[in-house]
A protein has these predicted regions:
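Charged, low-complexity surface patches
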Residues: 12, 134, 144, 187, ...
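A short N-terminal beta-strand-loop micro-motif at the entrance of redox/enzyme domains
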Residues: 9-15
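Iron-sulfur-associated redox domains of electron-transfer enzymes in respiratory
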Residues: 15-68, 74, 78, 206-562
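Short structural boundary motif marking the start of a folded domain
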Residues: 1-4
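Short strand-turn-strand beta-turns centered on an Asx-Gly dipeptide
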Residues: 6-9, 52-54
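Fe-S ferredoxin-like electron-transfer domains
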Residues: 46-190, 203-218, 222
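Conserved glycine-bearing catalytic or ligand-binding loops at nucleotide- and phosphate-handling centers
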Residues: 195
Length: 562
């Protein structure tokens, strides 16, 4: 604890880990390209450089605050220094900004404008590299890389994968997969966190918007959309609506106006997932086999297990993800000529997750060897489509989803935040429907920001040991403990992205804990407003089991990971 003088003003600090944090606490938005509080300090971009009263310059991100420090953040020397750094970065950077997918959201572009860089005095001598589009989810363009290392640290430290790293030195330095492999040839799980942390267009989402527009323009095609829970609390950010507010009704209106024929809510199939997964869990607990049960909703987590913990593949739940269940059910529904009305059905999935693109083409997620989810677009792609269509989103009136697959429970909505799957399972297993019981379940340890949460819940005279993890680095810690016999769980829920789908690789990029908290709160608020809290109380789900699903539960709702 102490006091610093920043640009002539006294600023107190307590437990801030670096000078940069204290400066921002003082209300000064000092620029950075390589600093993120969630990962280790790299100090490579030097944009956060400041000057002290002795004329010494240093990177504020890697300097600890000390009592009595006198800091100048915008001296003449510092301003020239920052401008020169950006100019040098741009000199070695692909500058096709008008056609770049990151245009308008690029941090480097914003800094060039902010610092007044209008002329590049230096020649670009950097080698041109081949664009890597081998991944079903992401595109890597090394020509737009500024060597900030954000993707490297996110992949290694947050996800524990290490698919990317630096190679070579000096002017030949580049970020690539090991042995210069294509990204699809590595252990990349398609989570998209590298794209979230990348400040430029060096890593971007592989878009499938053109396929959607093509389907919408075909009069012989019925275009059906499903919308994941986390999407509804992220779209509003783009239109300056309050952070985390659910805008599901506006999204439905926008999709109807763009020409989608049917729009369904993935919370419906989340309820199906809970029905199937809770039954599977109880069966395994009773038999005492294939425990712990590993949830299978997150495709990045599933790929992580199938790639790196093959001995635990039998522990994965055989349940399809909510996306997979919804697509299979809808395709089955429209196989009935009375429902099909002579049209081909194209299933479009709108997800917060880049890994869902990979899941959709995974052969073991098909039904009768046919792909159920035809196209997956992310929240970010949805925003571009809405903007492309010219809709004034903020002014749209809310509309309800279509039936019979447009209604879900509160348990289905909270799938979008870490711990939501487990909480919905616990609700399903509880015989008590009271508000007090629902509150007790929510307070048992299933909610919160911790990367690893462990708790025990009583069930029919036995203790159920549960672990909830978010971020694959945390998941690896959990799996190593299980593998070494250091932990004994009955149920493990993992979401590859920190805080869950609300911060997925396909979501609009908004830094900071406030965004995470607001999106999580938005889903919990949506849950609070729903009359039905438990998946087994959803009348549309119960009706489906008595009708379309009868005798087809395993075929449509489960898959085989072997």
């Amino acid at each position: 604890m102490g006091t610093m003088t920043i640009d002539g003003r006294k600023v107190e600090f307590t437990d801030e880990k670096n000078v940069l944090t204290v400066i921002r606490k003082a209300g000064i938005n000092i620029p950075t390209l390589c600093y993120h509080s969630e990962v280790s300090t790299f100090g490579a971009c030097r944009l956060c450089t400041v000057e002290d009263d002795r004329g010494r310059t240093f990177a504020s991100c890697s300097e600890e605050p000390r009592d009595g420090m006198v800091i100048y953040t915008n001296s003449g020397k510092i301003k020239k220094y920052r401008k020169l750094i950006v100019e040098l970065l741009l000199a070695a950077h692909c500058r096709d900004c008008t056609t770049c997918v990151k245009s308008g959201e690029c941090v480097l572009q914003e800094l060039a404008h902010r610092l007044g860089v209008h002329n590049i005095r230096f020649q670009n001598t950097r080698e041109q590299y081949e664009i890597d589009d081998s991944s079903p989810s992401l595109i890597r363009d090394p020509n737009k890389c500024i060597l900030c290392g954000d993707c490297v640290r996110a992949c290694e430290e947050l996800q524990g994968i290490g698919a990317l790293n630096f190679a070579y030195r000096g002017t030949e330095a580049i970020v690539i997969p090991a042995f210069n492999k294509k990204i699809a040839e590595t252990q990349c799980v398609n989570c998209g966190q590298c794209r979230v942390y990348c400040p430029t267009g060096a890593i971007s989402i592989k878009t499938h918007m053109d396929e959607v527009w093509e389907a919408l323009a075909d009069p012989d095609v019925r275009v059906v959309a499903q919308i994941a829970p986390a999407v509804r609390v992220a779209v509003g950010d783009h239109y300056s609506l309050p952070k985390g507010r659910s805008v599901m009704g506006k999204i439905v209106n926008a999709l109807h106006r763009m020409g989608f024929d049917e729009i369904y809510d993935t919370t419906f199939s989340a309820d199906l997932t809970i029905m199937e997964e809770s039954a599977e869990f109880l069966k395994r607990v009773e038999k005492g086999e294939k425990l712990p049960l590993l949830t299978s909703c997150c495709p990045a987590w599933v790929k992580f297990i199938t790639d790196q913990y093959k001995d635990y593949i039998p522990n994965l739940s055989t349940c399809r993800s909510p996306q997979g269940m919804m697509s299979a059910v809808i395709k089955e529904y429209f196989r009935d000529p009375e429902n099909a009305k002579g049209k081909k059905t194209v299933m479009v999935s709108i997800m917060p997750c880049t890994a869902k693109k990979a899941e959709a083409i995974r052969p073991n997620s098909f039904t009768d060897e046919k792909q159920d989810t035809d196209i997956v677009i992310t929240t970010t792609e949805l925003l571009r489509m809405i903007d492309n269509f010219g809709l004034d989103f903020a002014q749209l009136e809310p509309e309800a989803c279509d039936m019979p697959f447009g209604f879900g429970s509160g348990g289905g909505v909270i799938f979008g935040v870490t711990g939501g799957v487990t909480e919905a399972v616990l609700r399903r297993l509880s015989p008590d429907h009271s508000k007090e019981t629902m509150r007790e379940i929510s307070e048992c340890g299933v909610r919160g920001d911790e990367g690893i949460k462990e708790f025990t819940v009583p069930y029919k005279g036995m203790d159920i040991n549960v672990c909830v993890a978010s971020g694959l680095a945390n998941a690896r810690t959990v799996m190593e403990r299980v593998k070494n016999g250091e932990a004994n769980y009955h149920l493990i829920e993992v979401m590859a992205c920190r805080r869950g789908c609300i911060m997925g690789g396909g979501q609009p990029v908004r830094a900071g804990d406030r965004t995470k908290a607001a999106r999580a709160k938005g889903l919990y608020n949506a849950d609070n407003t729903m009359l039905i809290k438990k998946s087994d109380e959803n009348p549309m789900v119960l009706e489906l089991y008595q009708g379309l699903l009868k005798g087809k539960e395993h075929k449509l709702l489960h898959n085989d990971f072997f």
